[in-house]
Amino acid sequence: MKNYSQYHQDIMNQKLENIRNNIQCSFEFFPPKNSFLEENLWSTVNRLSLLKPKFFSVTYGANTGEREKTYDTVQKIYKKTGIITAAHLTCIDSTPHKLKEIAYNYWNSGIKSIVALRGDTLEKDYRHTMYAVDLVLLLKKIADFDISVAAYPELHPESKNVKSDILNLKKKVDAGASRAITQFFFNIESYLRFRDNCIKNKINIDIIPGILPVCNFQKLKRFSSMTNVKIPKWMLDMFNGLDDDIFTQKIIGSSIAIDMVKKLSCEGVKNFHFYTLNQSDITYSICHILGL
């Protein structure tokens, strides 16, 4: 008689082994605003460094103080861990001259990776507004930066349609982008359709899914409404009645992220970018369960 218990265990082990051998992860942080948050960031960096990620990235604020914090944080993480650390850089609130200065400083200090973004629109009316494609072109003229750009499986909030979104991404790729990191999402079919559209339009770079482990569902709903990210009904049902139970929310959030990585891995996805929110516990748990 067939030992089904052993049979199912072997299947599970094989699936985890396939994931362990075929995928890599990267992690996003944001610059800390005070000493308490800085201590928390370093605790997170130190713990996630143990997973030997492909790279880290550090977000970029829209004012001068935040910019300097990004630069300092990128430098410190890279020097302390030796792991490639990509600096986010936005162009909507800057000038070509200032961007060149920032880029030269990064390159000359050993930071060769940039996440090139337009940045969120601001109330102030900036003339000569630059776009992400302009920033990619500017960076490539300065040095051979390894450049990541943004992609939107569920449409950029300001885009007219899918076609314009794909065209914009293609322009960034043709300008020299090496990969695209997506906005977070929860509908796997949205990502797969987007990837298919990219292939049809000869966009041949890696489209890395951005994974956001849910820690606080109420905050997620508010943020999703601003970013055009759709929350599926099954997910609303899962978190129903848990507004005051953050612990259970984290467990469910971990389960959703693990399931997403497994399913996307079966579809040939090999790289995943985690939005950590500077918290290591849930992200580390997810990666540990996946055997990373």
Swiss-Prot record:
Locate the residues binding (6S)-5-methyl-5,6,7,8-tetrahydrofolate.
120, 183
| Co-factor(s) | FAD
One Gene Ontology molecular-function label? methylenetetrahydrofolate reductase (NADH) activity
Q: Which residues bind FAD?
A: 60, 62, 88, 118-120, 132, 152, 156, 165, 168, 171-172
EC number annotated for this UniProt entry: 1.5.1.54
Please give the SUPFAM superfamilies that the UniProt record associates with this protein.
Answer: FAD-linked oxidoreductase (SSF51730)
Q: Which GO terms describe its cellular component?
A: cytosol
Query: What GO biological process terms are annotated to this protein in UniProt?
Result: methionine biosynthetic process; tetrahydrofolate interconversion
Tell me the route in metabolism or biology where this protein functions: One-carbon metabolism; tetrahydrofolate interconversion; Amino-acid biosynthesis; L-methionine biosynthesis via de novo pathway
Answer whether the UniProt record assigns the keyword Flavoprotein to this protein.
yes
> Which chemical reaction does it catalyze?
(6S)-5-methyl-5,6,7,8-tetrahydrofolate + NAD(+) = (6R)-5,10-methylene-5,6,7,8-tetrahydrofolate + NADH + H(+)
Gene3D superfamilies membership: 3.20.20.220
First-level EC class:
oxidoreductase
Q: Where are the transmembrane segments?
A: none
- The residues the record assigns to binding NADH are 59, 183
Q: Which InterPro entries match?
A: FAD-linked_oxidoreductase-like, Mehydrof_redctse-like, MTHF_reductase_bac
| Catalytic residues as annotated in Swiss-Prot or TrEMBL | 28 (proton donor/acceptor)
Keyword NAD among UniProt keywords = yes
Record keywords, A-Z: Amino-acid biosynthesis, FAD, Flavoprotein, Methionine biosynthesis, NAD, Oxidoreductase
Family of the protein in this entry: Belongs to the methylenetetrahydrofolate reductase family.
- Function description: Catalyzes the NADH-dependent reduction of 5,10-methylenetetrahydrofolate to 5-methyltetrahydrofolate. Is required to provide the methyl group necessary for methionine synthetase to convert homocysteine to methionine; the methyl group is given by 5-methyltetrahydrofolate.
Supply the name of the protein.
5,10-methylenetetrahydrofolate reductase
